[in-house]
């Protein structure tokens, strides 16, 4: 049980996919202008990352490895992610049309989010079992969502802040992301994986 807790905390805080591994930067910068949109994108990405991580592990373990087709791993995982994203898009469209309109083009772009593919590939490379794969996918998604929501809240405050003209927009956003990354580095002594 302690190993699973360490895996969760380590993935969310210490080895955060956005701030440490630099995966998922496109939605991090693109969807984080409004808190509401960032929260919706975080929830959708959490669902997709967790489900894609589980499906990728199952396909790798039950199909690719037994049939000696591991060279198709990346292609198979991309197809799995695309199917999961389409399923998520249908669910969001039915349950929350307002969120579906807010997310716009970013929902289908989860398919190309390198963090989702990164989770699936890292699960295999790290040798995780089924439960560890599910937890790792969920923890990576929670870390992604946490950073997205924090960054969106900061960016909303930066809009009304007195920022010098050369630093307005993406410049101050990148500086803020760098400072957030430094803050998350403080967690590095918390858990050793």
Curated annotation (Swiss-Prot):
Disulfide bonds: none annotated. One of its GO terms (cellular component) is plasma membrane. It is an enzyme of class 7 (translocase). GO terms for biological process: electron transport chain. Belongs to the NqrDE/RnfAE family. Part of a membrane-bound complex that couples electron transfer with translocation of ions across the membrane. PANTHER family: INTEGRAL MEMBRANE PROTEIN OF SOXR-REDUCING COMPLEX, ION-TRANSLOCATING OXIDOREDUCTASE COMPLEX SUBUNIT A. The complex is composed of six subunits: RnfA, RnfB, RnfC, RnfD, RnfE and RnfG. This is Ion-translocating oxidoreductase complex subunit A.
């Amino acid at each position: 049980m302690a190993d699973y807790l360490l895996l969760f905390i380590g993935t969310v805080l210490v080895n955060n996919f956005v701030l440490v591994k630099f995966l998922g930067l496109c939605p991090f910068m693109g969807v984080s202008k409004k808190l509401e949109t960032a929260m919706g994108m975080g929830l959708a990405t959490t669902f997709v990352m967790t489900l894609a991580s589980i499906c990728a592990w199952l396909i790798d373990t039950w199909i690719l490895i037994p049939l000696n087709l591991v060279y198709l791993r990346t292609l198979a995982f991309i197809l799995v992610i695309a199917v999961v994203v389409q399923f998520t898009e249908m669910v969001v469209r039915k349950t929350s049309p307002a969120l579906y309109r807010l997310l716009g083009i970013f929902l289908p772009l989860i398919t190309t989010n390198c963090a989702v593919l990164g989770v699936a590939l890292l699960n295999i490379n790290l040798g995780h079992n089924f439960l560890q794969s599910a937890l790792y996918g969920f923890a990576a998604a929670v870390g992604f969502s946490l950073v997205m929501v924090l960054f969106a809240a900061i960016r909303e405050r930066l809009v009304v802040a007195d920022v010098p003209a050369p630093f307005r927009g993406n410049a101050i956003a990148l500086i803020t992301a760098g400072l957030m990354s430094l803050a998350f580095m403080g967690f590095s002594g918390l858990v050793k994986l």
